[in-house]
């Protein structure tokens, strides 16, 4: 098995009751929006870590839920972000538009951003 590299996104949304429900909600978003699926999970009394990947890349996205974090994380100015290359850019754009998760489009550059349930911007490139 390849050694996969992980990206970390920490989720602390207080809007969902129960960490299990929250984990399902975030995993569902990333699966539907970016075709990432869960490859492994670590669950303790204090946190849940879920690793997402696809069958194309050797990268993993790490989602972490901290039980006792009292408020949403400060996302800064969103200058740091992840970019995902779409195999079918037009189909991806249509799907994201239907999902209502497009938060910014730059037609001149031929890119757009979607926003995850925590407010992280994810760039979509052709």
What are these regions (language model features)?
Residues 46, 78, 108:
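Exposed loop/turn and edge beta-strand positions of beta-sandwich/beta-sheet ligand-binding modules
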Residues 17-18, 84:
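Short hydrophobic beta-strand elements that form part
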Residues 1-9, 15-16, 40, 51, ...:
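Vicinal oxygen chelate
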Residues 13-15, 77-81:
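Eukaryotic phosphotyrosine signaling hubs
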Residues 2, 8, 18-60, 113:
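Core segments of cupin and vicinal oxygen chelate
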Residues 55-59, 68-70, 88-90:
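Short, charged/polar surface micro-motifs in flexible loops or helix N-caps
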């Amino acid at each position: 098995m390849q050694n996969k590299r992980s990206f970390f996104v920490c989720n602390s949304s207080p809007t969902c009751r129960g960490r299990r429900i929250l984990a399902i909600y975030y995993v569902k978003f990333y699966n539907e929006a970016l075709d990432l699926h869960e490859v492994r999970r670590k669950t303790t009394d204090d946190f849940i870590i879920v690793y997402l990947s696809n069958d194309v890349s050797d990268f993993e996205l790490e989602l972490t839920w901290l039980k006792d974090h009292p408020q949403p994380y400060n996302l800064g100015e969103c200058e740091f972000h992840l970019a995902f290359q779409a195999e079918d850019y037009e189909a991806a754009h249509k799907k994201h538009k239907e999902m209502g998760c497009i938060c910014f489009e730059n037609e001149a550059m031929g890119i757009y951003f979607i926003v995850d349930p925590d407010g992280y911007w994810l760039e979509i490139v052709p």
